[in-house]
Amino acid sequence: FFRWLDRGAPLTGDIRTRHIMRVTGAADGHVRHGMFLGTGAIMQATRFAHKTVHSRGLGGELSLGMVLVRSVWGLIRQDPKFYQPTHVAIAVQNGSGAEVTRDTAPMLILVASTLGRLFLGIRPFWAKDEAPIGLTAIQGGARRFARAFPSVLRGHPNRHVTVENGYESFGGARIELRFDGELNLDGELFATAGGDVPLVIETEGPIRFLRAK
């Protein structure tokens, strides 16, 4: 398909190749595609952004920074407006086909992406697995959160970021999440089918993108 497009309008310039996520298991049965997915506190942060920041006409990385600071402060204080863990079971198939599973547990923050770097230079994935999807899970009640989380954002976990303390990062080629609730996929909010139907995240691509200057 993309070769066909190139014959009529070849891409030139700063070309980047990226995988995208293919997501199934939504309540409406639709297949979706995106590069960033999150649930748990991501949902509370999204609602705060829509209600308090975007409604005032603020946008761009400045608004994202405001939302991040307010959300992290709410999580540190365990403010119930932001501190609402979502119970999720995880199954990750890595690049070699081996599967890692985690039983259902309250997840304070769960994010997945095919991008190594997110907005504001955030790099929340530190798994060593060679796989197209990064997945990071922070459990509800994660210890030393105020000291650990800044290093999580940088992708260079400090000594507080351990599985025992409630922090874990994976690399996967296929991910299954089982939970009843909502998630954010590139800004679109939707509900999972729940029950016995997993939310399945796979990859398509790589696809070429022309970077805007």
Regions flagged by a language model, labelled:
Residues 38, 42, 109-124, 184, ...:
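Glycine-rich phosphate/pyrophosphate-binding beta-alpha loops
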Residues 33, 72-82, 117-123, 142-153:
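Short N-terminal helix-initiation segments at or just after the protein's N-terminus
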Residues 28-32, 83-87, 102-108, 113, ...:
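Short gly/pro-enriched beta-turn/loop segments at secondary-structure junctions
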